[in-house]
């Protein structure tokens, strides 16, 4: 969903164990490899070795059509990873139950967050949302109850 250390820290180990591919929105390429931007320099720098596949919009993987909807703000490449056929969204740190992701980090932007919130409000259909932290929620619940979505 994005390139911050708490979302990519185990990638090298997972790739070594499972020989899997790693996909990331193209706008977070620098975030993945730069310890200042992915924030790992605040704890233990990651020094990522995995080769990633950059994505702009859609991929097909294991029979799933997966949309990477770029919703910048938390990072430039933050995305909803959407499994449309199953009405599931992995939201990373874009949106949480009752909140949105921080926008005060390097590579973050309040202006982009506001634009992304407007995009989220325009998504039709109800989806089950699995955020990067905290409990799951639904898109309908967030449209009704999330104060950040309702302020704009």
Feature map (PLM): residue ranges:
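Active-site HxH/HxHxD metal-binding segment of metal-dependent hydrolases
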Residues: 1-61, 145-148
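Metallo-beta-lactamase
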Residues: 34-42, 67-72, 76-152
């Amino acid at each position: 969903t994005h390139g911050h250390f708490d979302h990519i820290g185990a990638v090298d180990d997972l790739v070594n164990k499972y020989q899997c591919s790693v996909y990331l929105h193209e706008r977070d390429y620098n975030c993945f490899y730069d310890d200042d931007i992915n924030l790992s320099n605040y704890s233990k720098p990651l020094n990522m070795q995995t080769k990633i596949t950059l994505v702009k919009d859609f991929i097909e993987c294991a029979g799933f059509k997966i949309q990477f909807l770029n919703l910048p703000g938390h990072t430039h490449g933050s995305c909803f990873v959407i499994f449309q056929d199953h009405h599931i969204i992995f939201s990373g740190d874009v949106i949480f139950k009752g909140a949105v992701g921080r926008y005060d980090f390097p590579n973050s932007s309040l202006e982009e967050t506001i634009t992304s919130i407007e995009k989220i409000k325009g998504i039709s259909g109800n989806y089950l949302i699995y955020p990067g932290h905290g409990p799951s929620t639904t898109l309908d619940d967030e449209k009704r109850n999330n104060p950040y979505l309702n302020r704009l």
